[in-house]
């Protein structure tokens, strides 16, 4: 049978999602816990998105195959009892063999939280990005609006990105001032490697006056990663939702509704 899970994790504790020889990744820890519940059998998970080291998930979706018959609650409470405190399974659903956590998804959502304050916060360390002064949010919003739609996002793509095409449909890019933070909410059919962090980094340059909103259009048109500002820190980035067709009957389009930092 095939089981889908909704999970959340604090990325500070791990070297990213994808399995590594040293074993300190979210996937490694989850596979081991699931394997124990499955009767000490090997379990391999597949995720909607492969988050980098330091990146968090308020709602990641994974699936795995198993011939172990267990109540769904065992894949939640039982697995959570074996996971470190930085990872939690939120829900479990049995799905058909035609479901794939990555390839069945038609959209993904991310949020980036940025603290703009002269002094960094030790209490929010690793949970938010930080910049030492206030930013021109109006200019950032103007620049963000120019990125909406279907474009070649090569200028905001990591050099090691393995996506077949750099063309993505960015459907939402909102910048919200809330609880003393800036929150960037992004929604697209899919994202390139480092795309969110590269967009946030470029918008920060607009906010501090190093780039104009018109410059963002030039960066987009250049289709050249070397023409854009550096990749911004991973600390404030959260995978917050994955969209699937209704036929799979997964919870609320798998969106995280409880993400608040303050």
UniProtKB/Swiss-Prot annotation:
Keyword Ion transport recorded: no
Chain residues that bind substrate: 110
Reaction catalyzed: uridine(38/39/40) in tRNA = pseudouridine(38/39/40) in tRNA
Gene3D superfamilies for this protein: Pseudouridine synthase I, catalytic domain, C-terminal subdomain, Pseudouridine synthase I, catalytic domain, N-terminal subdomain
GO annotation (BP), single: tRNA pseudouridine synthesis
Source organism superkingdom: Bacteria
Key words of the record: Isomerase, tRNA processing
One example GO MF annotation: RNA binding
Active-site residue numbers: 52 (nucleophile)
Pfam families: PseudoU_synth_1
E.C. number: 5.4.99.12
InterPro entries, per database record: PsdUridine_synth_cat_dom_sf (IPR020103), PsdUridine_synth_TruA (IPR001406), PsdUridine_synth_TruA_a/b_dom (IPR020097), PsdUridine_synth_TruA_C (IPR020095), TruA/RsuA/RluB/E/F_N (IPR020094)
Family that this chain belongs to: Belongs to the tRNA pseudouridine synthase TruA family.
Subunit comment: Homodimer.
Protein task: Formation of pseudouridine at positions 38, 39 and 40 in the anticodon stem and loop of transfer RNAs.
Protein's name according to its UniProt entry: tRNA pseudouridine synthase A
Organism this protein belongs to: Chromobacterium violaceum (strain ATCC 12472 / DSM 30191 / JCM 1249 / CCUG 213 / NBRC 12614 / NCIMB 9131 / NCTC 9757 / MK)
């Amino acid at each position: 049978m095939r089981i889908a899970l909704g999970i959340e994790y604090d990325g500070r504790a791990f070297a990213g999602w994808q399995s590594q020889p040293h074993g300190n990744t979210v996937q490694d820890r989850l596979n081991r816990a699931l394997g124990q519940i499955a009767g000490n059998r090997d379990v391999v998970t597949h995720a909607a998105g492969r988050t980098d080291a330091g990146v968090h998930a308020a709602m990641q979706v994974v699936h795995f195959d198993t011939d172990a018959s267990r109540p769904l609650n065992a894949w939640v409470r039982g697995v959570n009892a074996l996971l470190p405190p930085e990872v939690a399974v939120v829900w479990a659903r049995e799905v058909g063999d035609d479901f794939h956590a990555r390839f069945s998804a038609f959209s993904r959502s991310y949020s980036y939280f940025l603290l703009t304050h002269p002094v960094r916060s030790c209490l929010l360390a690793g949970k938010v990005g930080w910049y030492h002064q206030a930013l021109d949010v109006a200019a950032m919003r103007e620049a963000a609006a120019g990125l909406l739609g279907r474009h070649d996002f090569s200028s905001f793509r990591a050099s090691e990105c393995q996506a077949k095409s750099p063309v993505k449909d960015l459907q939402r890019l909102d910048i919200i001032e809330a609880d003393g933070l800036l929150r960037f909410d992004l929604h697209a059919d899919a994202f390139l490697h480092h795309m969110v962090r590269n967009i946030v980094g470029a918008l920060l340059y607009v906010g501090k006056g190093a780039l104009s909103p018109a410059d963002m259009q030039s960066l987009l048109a250049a289709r050249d990663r070397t023409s854009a500002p550096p990749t911004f820190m991973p600390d404030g980035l959260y995978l917050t939702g994955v969209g699937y067709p209704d036929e799979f009957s997964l919870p609320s389009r798998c969106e995280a509704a409880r993400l608040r930092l303050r």
